[in-house]
């Protein structure tokens, strides 16, 4: 089958960005969200999602004119329009009851040939389709994108034991050839593949950061390009993903895998999430967005290894706890200074 038109339900950070990527591929997309009772515009959330995508940095659209391919609407007035789409993807809140309620409504209006998908980052797919018809279950397959979806190549495709293998094949080909994704077919287990590994790494990094008195920036200096990983490293990745998402995934995985890896969140992280410090989506996480849209550390660092050729590379180990560095400490000796000659802790 060919996917000529799609619908994304949920116009939050991920939903709007996925809609933008579909538009980038030339696919008309219907973007729906709930109606806010205190807003006169019933499509307020969907419109806000498109506006956010237009302002996103890095850019969500290849060309802002592509936004014209996105039709905005709401779940009360426009749900019936799902009868015209070939693929429905949900990107709503990570609560199983909410997904059950949504799929019950979607099944009543979606056409019988449409593929149905969830972008859930951790809720097992087989739990989402409980109570749905055999035909719905046959066409249901998880599609887990990563933020920002225009730039991150990976797409996890997660079938259940009810999913038609032909649906998996057709959808995977669409994702690879039309959306330009690198597809990994994952088992329908808590956290799938990437989050089972990645969120565990973030949680363990938090635990070690507090244990050894490190800062987020110091941890990122250790766990980014120095290890052959992306420059976003650990905590910039967490900010991009959304700290609330990290919290949900870690809690969900930890709750169903008590005999496996430790997914216990630190109290300081829980306090951040409870206080609305959620990463890029709230403007502040482990890093804080500045007016020029560049993320700056929210926490000071003790000794910054250079990231340009004109600065000294500090020989003072970045893992040295701040408590061990007094204001009168001997300045670090640079390894290969070109212009700078010292690297003293602040």
UniProtKB/Swiss-Prot annotation:
Say yes or no: keyword Ribonucleoprotein present.
Answer: no
| GO biological process terms on file | catabolic process; fatty acid metabolic process
Q: Which UniProt keywords apply?
A: Fatty acid metabolism, Lipid metabolism, NAD, Oxidoreductase
- The organism's superkingdom is given as Bacteria
The kind of enzyme this is, by top-level EC class, is oxidoreductase
Instruction: Note the InterPro entries from the entry.
Output: 3-OHacyl-CoA_DH, 3-OHacyl-CoA_DH_NAD-bd, 3HC_DH_C, 6-PGluconate_DH-like_C_sf, NAD(P)-bd_dom_sf
Query: Pfam family of this protein, just one?
Result: 3HCDH
Identify the stretch(es) annotated as Disordered. Answer: 322-346
Gene Ontology molecular-function annotations:
3-hydroxyacyl-CoA dehydrogenase activity; NAD+ binding; oxidoreductase activity
Enzyme Commission number(s): 1.1.1.35
Q: Which reaction does it catalyse?
A: a (3S)-3-hydroxyacyl-CoA + NAD(+) = a 3-oxoacyl-CoA + NADH + H(+)
Q: Which family does it belong to?
A: Belongs to the 3-hydroxyacyl-CoA dehydrogenase family.
> What additional remark is attached to this entry?
On the 2D-gel the determined pI of this protein is: 6.00, its MW is: 83 kDa.
Q: What is this protein called?
A: Probable 3-hydroxyacyl-CoA dehydrogenase
Native species: Deinococcus radiodurans (strain ATCC 13939 / DSM 20539 / JCM 16871 / CCUG 27074 / LMG 4051 / NBRC 15346 / NCIMB 9279 / VKM B-1422 / R1)
